[in-house]
Each structure stands twice: as structure tokens, then as C-alpha cells.
UniProtKB/Swiss-Prot annotation:
The lineage of its organism: Eukaryota, Viridiplantae, Streptophyta, Embryophyta, Tracheophyta. Residues 622-645 are annotated as: Disordered. The keyword Kinase does not apply. Gene3D superfamilies: 1.20.1270.10, 3.30.30.30, 3.30.420.40, Actin, Chain A, domain 4, Substrate Binding Domain Of DNAk, Chain A, domain 1. The keyword Nucleotide-binding applies. NCBIfam families: PRK00290.1 (NF001413). It comes from Zea mays. SUPFAM superfamilies: Actin-like ATPase domain (SSF53067), Heat shock protein 70kD (HSP70), C-terminal subdomain (SSF100934), Heat shock protein 70kD (HSP70), peptide-binding domain (SSF100920). One of its GO terms (cellular component) is cytoplasm. Keywords: ATP-binding, Nucleotide-binding, Stress response. One of its GO terms (molecular function) is protein folding chaperone. PROSITE patterns: HSP70_1, HSP70_2, HSP70_3. This is Heat shock 70 kDa protein.
Length: 645
């Protein structure tokens, strides 16, 4: 590990909550934030004066719904026109627009309109997680392992990596969330198990859902198959409840709250709380005072109703499980352990669906909120050479989607089938489609459909300079190469001429350019400086406020008041009252103004207090809130001291 870079950390960048861990003293430490919470909301908010991230952003969301963003993970690496983005936008109070089919989030910040890409919002959450770790470890952190849903496609992975760069992190590795959870499970069980184990990780979080089937043996974690839905999670269960209660409010009060972001936000928060309560009780009451136009809303909600509202989504959770078993060519009876990860797996109905495994006991020994960060921290320690005795751990992950290229007639020709272990490299020879064809267009796709138009285009490039020849004669070798981060390089070579061309799939359509990333890194620095400026301002304001109120209390103290001449007391009272009323009307003043006001107030109060103490004989110590370096009393007050050469 390079000196001065601090330890490497593992970050679970979640849709709704994020978590950070570090390998220390031979174990993983999940780090609590400044509020004492071990998970931090993935929320970012902008107000008229400052930027808020984490708990502070989530706590003010009801007052400021349109300038608070959450769920950036549901936008990252996606196109604005995609159905998933369009359907989510209807539920978000913040404004979004498409810039060349890239979703942008619009905020009002300090009276100006600002646009941010999802990568920037995610980078702000990553910065927050980095700062939480730095505060705990007392050193600067540069290296991190960041997790993504196993079913994230190439562009979503690239965009997550970009977010890390903007946050000033060196993302050593992007690993899949269920694989990270499997590491946590594997280390937890290491002492008690021997032989090969087939483990199914069922990871249902706030916004994404993954299922992975792994074989674990002697520190080797081999992913056999993975499946999932990058747009299914706890948020969707909340949405169903919100929609249900919007209708109920309409029915009871003949009023529609769906156009009021603040009312909707308060309802969503209450629904989220109710959902959690219903995991441990059969019914609960939602209480919201003055939800809309002064009307209180206190509906009852039962677990049965919650399950009915979401039954189709719960059933949907089983499809990837079945697909995963099919792909791995494994029978459900061969699964030794089913591990639940993600907060949404606490829902009793989700746990019941596991009856699919014929009543197999579910493994709940690992914390579903922290398992992913735990595994990422272990991987970070291995990659940076810290977790020495863990270096016998080997991860064999897979690519979640088939990769191939378009051949004549729009057909998808697969070179790397889904669930192929990575890193991997595959070659195939292609030829021209017509006589004397001077070049070929290589179009790279990912997806499972037979025709390329139904799959996702990752990128394309041209191989030109092919000598004239009848169709089918030229031999063009196409190579697909996937690295450990699941990032794809494609190259094509004409065997006769040695002519070569290649592309690293960076999904140019939605990917940020180097220049844009540079600009965003600078912006991140700027926002950080602004955040520090705000903190300085708050500290200076608080110092002035404390001093003024301390001084007011000091002169109200009978012991002190009796020793102060009336005119001095009046002088202090006037100065303190003046400072407090100035504070009330100048909350947004600059640091210098607060400091000047403080000096002015000290200049009036300190000499009077010092004179009073000095008048009593040798100084008896300063009054409450008085500065050590206050000017000494006036002439004749107390003993004179001469300077000795």
C-alpha cells in the first residue's frame, strides 16, 4: 500500500442507504457516521445557503422536497428515455430533464438553477462515506472498493466508477453486491464449515434486487449464476402504499394531494415507517397532522393490506431465483444455505416466499444492512495487501448479461454467454457480407434477445482498409476481453493485412467524457470549499451568540451585578442587546462580519469585567465567556508591573 494513502475502505453505495467498512485489527469495522448511525441515507439536498448530504438532507426533505434528491442509483448509467427512468420520475418531487438522453437533476441552489448528472449526486454520497471513514481513522483515504448490483449493465458500472473518480477516490475494484455479501457470510461461517457449499444470496435492497448462486469452498467463492431486477426494491413497496393512501385521502376528503410535493413527502416518510413497523406487528396507525389544507390524516394499515398491495412485486422476486437455479443447472434441493441481504428482506412475506426452498431455515446471522460493506472492506484489504491472512480468498465472479455483436440481418451473435466467469477472453472469426466490401462495422451489444434491436447497444467501431475480395473470403478475428471489473474491450483484426482496431466499451452515449469528469472533480472541490465556508460561518455565528448570551447571564448574576457601576452595566447591556438584534437580522452575514462584531463586543465588555475583577485586588479569573487575552484594567487598577530588560 502506498504511504500516506491510509487504509483502503469498502463502500456499499446503496439506492436509499450507504454503508462503509474498513479492515482493522484483524476484523472488519463498520463505521458509524456523526449521528452514530452505521448506515447513511443516500440523500443530497441544496438549500438557499448550503449543500446537505446524508442524515441532514433526509431530515429536511419535507420542507424542501423539490431540492432534495434520493434514488440517484436508479438513474445512474441509464438513458432519460428508458421506461425505468420515466416511471420513476413520476414519483420524484425533484425536477429532471434529459440532456442528449442523459438524465439530469435540476436544483435551485443559492438562488441559481443548477443541473447535476446522477454520477455527481452519487459522488457526493461517496465523498460523505469517505469523510465518515476519514473522521474515524484520522487519516486521508484514497483507495476504495465500491459495490454495484450484480445485474448492473456495463454503462451502470462505468458510471459508478466515474462517480468514484469525481469523489477523488481510486476505485480499486467494482464488485457485485451479492458476491460481497457472500464474502461476509463465508468468513462468518468459515470456522464451522468444511467441504463445498452451494449458497444462494437473496439481496433485496431499497431500489435493486439481485440473486446470486455461489459455490464456496476453502476460500474460493465461485459465482455460478446471477439474476435480478435493477428496478425493484423497498422504494417500490413504499410507492404502492403512498398511491393507496393518496386514493384513500381523496375518497374521504374529496381532495387530491398528488400535486403537492410536501404532502406527498410527509406521507412517504410515514409509509416507510409503517412498512418497517408492519414487519414486527400485524397492524399500525399512520398519524400525520395537517397533511393537506389543515386536514389530519390517521388511517390504519394492516400487514395483510400491505401484502395485498405488493403481492405481484413479492411474486416477481421469485422469478430471478428460478432463473438463477436454471442457469446454474442446479436443483433447489442442492442449495445448502439461503442468505438474506438488504433491509427489505426483513418483510415477513419476502421471508415466506423462501418456502420455495421447502421450509429451509434462512441464514440471518449476518446483518442484512451491513453485509455488503463488510465484504467490500475485506476485498479492499486484500487488494491493498492489508488483510494478510485473508489473501487466500479468491473471487470468481460472472458477467450478468450475454455479450455479442450484430451480424447480417440484425442477428445477435453471442461471443460471451451470460454467467461466464470473469476475467475472460473469447475470439471468433467473421467475414464480409458482400463482394469487395472495404470495411466492416463492429456493433457490440449486451442482452439475451435473438435480435440486436431488442438488446442494448454498448458501442461500435469500423475496421476499414480490407483489400477487395469476394464475400466470405476476408478473415476478421473479433476478440472480446472482460477484465475483473466487468469492463469490456473489443478488438477486430483483418488477418491478411494485419489491420487492427479496438474499442473499450465505455457506452459513449451516456458516458461522461474525460473533460466532463475533470469539470465535475473541480466542481466537487468547489462545493467542498463552500461546505467548509458554511461551517466556518456557523462556528463564527455560534461563537458570537454564545459570547453575547454568556455576557448577558454574567451581568444578571447578582454577585457580579452588585459590583458593577450602573453605567458600566448599562453599557454592557446595550452592547449585548445590539449584538443579539444584529444577529437576528444578519443570520447570513460573512465570517468576517461575525468576527468583527465579536471583536467590537469584546472591546466593550472585556475591559469592564477585567476592571471589576482587578478592582477587587489580584485578578480572580475572568468572567464567563471572557477571553484570556482581554485588555487589562485601566490606570491605577491593581498592581503595576514593569518590564525588566
Amino acid at each position: 500500500m502506498a504511504k500516506g494513502e491510509g487504509p483502503a475502505i469498502g463502500i456499499d453505495l446503496g439506492t436509499t442507504y450507504s454503508c462503509v467498512g474498513v479492515w482493522q485489527h484483524d476484523r472488519v469495522e463498520i463505521i458509524a457516521n456523526d449521528q452514530g448511525n452505521r448506515t447513511t441515507p443516500s440523500y443530497v439536498a441544496f438549500t438557499d445557503t448550503e449543500r446537505l448530504i446524508g442524515d441532514a438532507a433526509k431530515n429536511q426533505v419535507a420542507m424542501n422536497p423539490t431540492n432534495t434528491v434520493f434514488d440517484a442509483k436508479r438513474l445512474i448509467g441509464r438513458r432519460f428515455s428508458s421506461p425505468a427512468v420515466q416511471s420513476s420520475m413520476k414519483l420524484w418531487p425533484s425536477r429532471h430533464l434529459g440532456l442528449g438522453d442523459k438524465p439530469m437533476i435540476v436544483f435551485n441552489y443559492k438562488g441559481e438553477e443548477k443541473q447535476f448528472a446522477a454520477e455527481e449526486i452519487s459522488s457526493m454520497v461517496l465523498i460523505k462515506m469517505k469523510e465518515i471513514a476519514e473522521a474515524y481513522l484520522g487519516s486521508t483515504i484514497k483507495n476504495a472498493v465500491v459495490t454495484v448490483p450484480a445485474y448492473f449493465n456495463d454503462s451502470q458500472r462505468q458510471a459508478t466508477k466515474d462517480a468514484g473518480v469525481i469523489a477523488g477516490l481510486n476505485v480499486m475494484r467494482i464488485i457485485n453486491e451479492p458476491t460481497a455479501a457472500a464474502i461476509a457470510y463465508g468468513l462468518d461461517k468459515k470456522a464451522t464449515s468444511s467441504g463445498e457449499k452451494n449458497v444462494l444470496i437473496f439481496d433485496l435492497g431499497g431500489g435493486t434486487f439481485d440473486v446470486s448462486l455461489l459455490t464456496i469452498e476453502e476460500g474460493i467463492f465461485e459465482v455460478k449464476a446471477t439474476a435480478g431486477d435493477t428496478h425493484l426494491g423497498g422504494e417500490d413497496f413504499d410507492n404502492r402504499m403512498v398511491n393507496h393512501f393518496v386514493q384513500e385521502f381523496k375518497r374521504k376528503n374529496k381532495k387530491d394531494i398528488s400535486g403537492n410535493p410536501r404532502a406527498l413527502r410527509r406521507l412517504r416518510t410515514a409509509c416507510e415507517r409503517a412498512k418497517r413497523t408492519l414487519s414486527s406487528t400485524a397492524q399500525t396507525t399512520i398519524e400525520i397532522d395537517s397533511l393537506f389544507e389543515g386536514i389530519d390524516f390517521t388511517p390504519r394499515s394492516s400487514r395483510a393490506r400491505f401484502e395485498e398491495l405488493n403481492m405481484d412485486l413479492f411474486r416477481k422476486c421469485m422469478e430471478p431465483v428460478e432463473k438463477c437455479l436454471r442457469d446454474a443447472k442446479m436443483d433447489k434441493s442442492s442449495v445448502h444455505d439461503v442468505v438474506l441481504v438488504g433491509g427489505s428482506t426483513r418483510i415477513p412475506k419476502v421471508q415466506q416466499l423462501q418456502d420455495f426452498f421447502n421450509g429451509k431455515e434462512l441464514c440471518k446471522s449476518i446483518n442484512p444492512d451491513e453485509a455488503v460493506a463488510y465484504g467490500a472492506a475485506v476485498q479492499a484489504a486484500i487488494l491493498s495487501g492489508e488483510g494478510n491472512e485473508r489473501s487466500d480468498l479468491l473471487l470468481l465472479d460472472v458477467t450478468p448479461l450475454s455479450l455479442g455483436l450484430e451480424t447480417a440481418g440484425g442477428v445477435m451473435t453471442v461471443l460471451i454467454p451470460r454467467n461466464t466467469t470473469i476475467p475472460t477472453k473469447k475470439e471468433q472469426v467473421f467475414s464480409t457480407y458482400s463482394d469487395n466490401q472495404p470495411g466492416v462495422l463492429i456493433q457490440v451489444y449486451e442482452g439475451e434477445r435473438a435480435r440486436t434491436k431488442d438488446n442494448n447497444l454498448l458501442g461500435k467501431f469500423e475496421l476499414s482498409g480490407i483489400p477487395p475480395a469476394p464475400r466470405g473470403v476476408p478473415q476478421i478475428t473479433v476478440t472480446f476481453d472482460i477484465d475483473v471489473n466487468n469492463i469490456l474491450n473489443v478488438s477486430a483484426e483483418d488477418k491478411t493485412t494485419g489491420q487492427k482496431n479496438k474499442i473499450t466499451i465505455t457506452n459513449d452515449k451516456g458516458r461522461l467524457s474525460k473533460e466532463e469528469i475533470e469539470k465535475m472533480v473541480q466542481e466537487a472541490e468547489k462545493y467542498k470549499a463552500e461546505d467548509e465556508e458554511v461551517k466556518k460561518k456557523v462556528d463564527a455565528k455560534n461563537a458570537l451568540e454564545n459570547y453575547a448570551y454568556n455576557m448577558r447571564n454574567t451581568i444578571k448574576d447578582d454577585k457580579i451585578a452588585s459590583k458593577l457601576p450602573a453605567e458600566d452595566k448599562k453599557k454592557i447591556e446595550d452592547a449585548v442587546d445590539g449584538a443579539i438584534s444584529w444577529l437576528d437580522s444578519n443570520q447570513l452575514a460573512e465570517v468576517e462580519e461575525f468576527e468583527d462584531k465579536m471583536k467590537e463586543l469584546e472591546g466593550i465588555c472585556n475591559p469592564i469585567i477585567a476592571k471589576m475583577y482587578x478592582g477587587e485586588g489580584a485578578g480572580m479569573g475572568a468572567a464567563a465567556g471572557m477571553d484570556e487575552d482581554a485588555p487589562s484594567g485601566g490606570s491605577g487598577a491593581g498592581p503595576k508591573i514593569e518590564e525588566v530588560d
